[in-house]
């Protein structure tokens, strides 16, 4: 259980969404259309450390990546400022 808690501590759902969106050459407006949210709402989600599973699933489908990718991808400590 302690290992799981440590892993969760290094996961940032919003940054995972942002990183994936950028890798796919998509802007927030384009993603907002796919998830049926406003661009400011997408921006807000990209800043959230924890996002509920239902919303994370919507982003995963829109970005065409597995749900677990967004849910469990750990931050690269070198890239965190």
Indicate where each model-derived feature is located.
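A short, Lys/Arg-rich alpha-helix, primarily the initiator
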Residues: 1-23
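Short basic helix-loop element that most often maps to the first helix and adjoining turn
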Residues: 15-34, 58
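Key DNA-contact positions within bacterial/archaeal DNA-binding proteins
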Residues: 29, 40, 68
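Recognition helix of helix-turn-helix/homeodomain-like DNA-binding domains
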Residues: 33-51, 72
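Short, basic-rich loop-to-helix N-cap that marks the start of a DNA-contacting helix
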Residues: 48-61, 67
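Short Cys/His-rich micro-motifs in 6-15 aa windows
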Residues: 75
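Conserved small/polar residues in nucleotide/adenosyl-binding loops
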Residues: 78-81
């Amino acid at each position: 259980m302690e290992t799981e808690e440590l892993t969760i501590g290094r996961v940032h759902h919003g940054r995972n969404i942002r990183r994936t969106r950028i890798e796919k050459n998509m802007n927030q407006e384009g993603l907002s259309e796919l998830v049926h949210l406003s661009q400011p709402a997408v921006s807000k989600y990209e800043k959230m450390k924890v996002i509920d599973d239902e919303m994370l699933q919507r982003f995963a489908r829109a970005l065409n990546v597995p749900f677990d990718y967004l849910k469990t991808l750990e931050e690269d400590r070198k890239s965190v400022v």
